[in-house]
Amino acid sequence: MTNIRKTHPLMKIVNNSFIDLPAPSNISSWWNFGSLLGICLILQILTGLFLAMHYTSDTMTAFSSVTHICRDVNYGWLIRYLHANGASMFFICLFLHVGRGLYYGSYMFMETWNIGVLLLFTVMATAFMGYVLPWGQMSFWGATVITNLLSAIPYIGTDLVEWIWGGFSVDKATLTRFFAFHFILPFIIAALAGVHLLFLHETGSNNPSGLSSDMDKIPFHPYYTIKDILGALVLILALSSLVLFSPDLLGDPDNYIPANPLNTPPHIKPEWYFLFAYAILRSIPNKLGGVLALVFSILVLALMPLLHTSKQRSMMFRPISQCLFWLLVADLLILTWIGGQPVEHPFIMIGQLASILYFSLILILMPLASLAENNLLKW
């Protein structure tokens, strides 16, 4: 009798994706982040669902409903902080996942990569709208500043902003629609992640060497299921430590002040995971130029397959490209730091230099280094 997991229409899909899937024998812990992102998404949907049971999306009661969750709901504080810090863990895993893709040339799987870039945009949009919901000072002013960027679009900009706001300023209509979008988007993300996986399984996983692993595959279960469980335990340990010991470490104290349209905070800044893009936005004095740079700072990832000039897929055996890659990582850390600083000397200049370096590395220096490395070897 054939095993039910190989014949049942539903079980067959699960079996071919997580049990009998042929996987390269040499993929390292950098390949754990896909499963960790799946765990993060499930955690966010579950905690978000329980928060939505007690949250009210009205400007008069939103802030106090979050306070009510933390004070009066059984383990409400835990659910709220798991959700807030779960978002941070989500982005840490996302950045590491994308970094892995850049380092090992995973972007050569075009469909998988492009859906990944779309997923990144969707997750960023979801996180931004979620940050608005507690209706604290930083929620309100963050929403005002970021949505206002659309007014830089010629001709339709102002109308577009007022259409998104549902009025002439960020108000009740804005909060209600942001809550609606914030609720629906994670399910769209889950569907996109399914398509992401579908395209990945068409080609099979990449591996650290960047060479074909068709001659040396092993079954996903038990080898990589046990490895993913270890990764999940490390993630849960890190998240638990953050939530239980310093839940407000990554948050902004200003968000504990109820939103007040008449009082602007001294430094408006988004959550830490958007600071690198925010620094790039601020480094350009022109409004439209800044918005374009902001969008392109993420969209540039979609160009990676076109910018690949090396004859090798992975950076594993390319020392010059490795140096430039880690320079890019350092540059992103500098941009993150600058994004959280006030707009004054010397931070303005550092931000501008770091922004120039960011685009130069990706668009010019790394492709040139790859060409140089091609000439260093006899092919």
From Swiss-Prot:
Requisite cofactors: heme b
Membrane topology: Multi-pass membrane protein
Localization, UniProt: Mitochondrion inner membrane
Record SUPFAM superfamilies: a domain/subunit of cytochrome bc1 complex (Ubiquinol-cytochrome c reductase), Transmembrane di-heme cytochromes
Major location (coarse): mitochondrion
Binding site for heme b b566: H97, H196
One MF term in the entry's GO annotations: ubiquinol-cytochrome-c reductase activity
Classification via CDD domains: cytochrome_b_C, Cytochrome_b_N
Top-level lineage group: Eukaryota
Transmembrane portions of the chain: 33-53, 77-98, 113-133, 178-198, 226-246, 288-308, 320-340, 347-367
GO CC annotation terms, alphabetical: mitochondrial inner membrane; respiratory chain complex III
Cofactor note: Binds 2 heme b groups non-covalently.
Keywords noted in UniProt: Electron transport, Heme, Iron, Membrane, Metal-binding, Mitochondrion, Mitochondrion inner membrane, Respiratory chain, Transmembrane, Transmembrane helix, Transport, Ubiquinone
Residues involved in heme b b562 binding: H83, H182
GO biological process, one term: mitochondrial electron transport, ubiquinol to cytochrome c
Binding site for a ubiquinone: H201
InterPro entries in UniProt: Cyt_b/b6_C, Cyt_b/b6_C_sf, Cyt_b/b6_N, Cytb/b6-like_sf, Cytochrome_b, Cytochrome_b_C_euk/bac, Cytochrome_b_N_euk/bac, Di-haem_cyt_TM
Function noted in UniProt: Component of the ubiquinol-cytochrome c reductase complex (complex III or cytochrome b-c1 complex) that is part of the mitochondrial respiratory chain. The b-c1 complex mediates electron transfer from ubiquinol to cytochrome c. Contributes to the generation of a proton gradient across the mitochondrial membrane that is then used for ATP synthesis.
Family: Belongs to the cytochrome b family.
Known partners and oligomeric status: The cytochrome bc1 complex contains 11 subunits: 3 respiratory subunits (MT-CYB, CYC1 and UQCRFS1), 2 core proteins (UQCRC1 and UQCRC2) and 6 low-molecular weight proteins (UQCRH/QCR6, UQCRB/QCR7, UQCRQ/QCR8, UQCR10/QCR9, UQCR11/QCR10 and a cleavage product of UQCRFS1). This cytochrome bc1 complex then forms a dimer.
Extra remark beyond the main annotation: Heme 1 (or BL or b562) is low-potential and absorbs at about 562 nm, and heme 2 (or BH or b566) is high-potential and absorbs at about 566 nm.
Protein name as catalogued: Cytochrome b
High-level lineage: Eukaryota, Metazoa, Chordata, Craniata, Vertebrata
Gene that this sequence comes from: MT-CYB
